[in-house]
């Protein structure tokens, strides 16, 4: 796992991951507030209305992939700025599968970067509303 958390993050929340053997050596702790996203989901959970996005320590984060992770066969790019997701991909060597997540905030604010990223991934995880926003199509069945 590679990422950043702020000094406000409750460290006890990492314990279950560590107990399951997750290598946390790529998680940085930076001075400041952790990323926050607040939303309201509709009844079907296929669309969310973003109420608040606070980037916090993500706004200055530059991922550094530990040497032990560079040749990972599977890479999941979590929901962060697509420019950072691309930076992560430049630091790994030939993964067999690359998946990414994104959200309406990045689709709206970093669309060109996100489209560039999508040329390098095998799988994207988004909900129906994000798919409509990304494709600019209302009919997802097409």
How does the language model describe each region?
Residues 54-60, 102-109:
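Short gly/ser/thr-rich secondary-structure transition/capping motifs
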Residues 93-97, 104-142:
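Conserved phosphate/ATP/ADP-binding segment of small-molecule kinases
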Residues 13, 84-91, 112-116:
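A short acidic, amphipathic alpha-helical/loop segment
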Residues 50, 86, 134-137:
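Glycine/threonine-rich flexible loop motifs
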Residues 74-76, 99, 125:
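Structural motif
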Residues 1-76, 90-95:
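Conserved N-terminal subdomain of the carbohydrate kinase-like
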Residues 6-8, 79-84, 103-107:
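Short beta->alpha connector loops
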């Amino acid at each position: 796992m590679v990422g950043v958390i702020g000094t406000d993050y409750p460290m006890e929340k990492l314990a279950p991951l560590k107990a399951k053997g997750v290598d946390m050596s790529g998680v940085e702790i930076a001075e400041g507030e952790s990323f926050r996203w607040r939303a309201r989901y509709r009844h079907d959970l296929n669309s969310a209305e973003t109420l608040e996005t606070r980037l916090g320590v993500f706004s200055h984060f530059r991922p550094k992939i530990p040497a032990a992770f560079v040749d990972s066969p599977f890479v999941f790019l979590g929901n962060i700025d697509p420019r950072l997701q691309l930076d992560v991909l430049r630091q790994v060597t030939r993964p067999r599968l690359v998946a990414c997540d994104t959200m309406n905030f990045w689709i709206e604010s970093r669309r060109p970067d996100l489209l560039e990223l999508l040329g390098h991934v095998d799988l994207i995880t988004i909900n129906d509303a994000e798919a409509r926003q990304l494709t600019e199509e209302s009919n997802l069945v097409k």
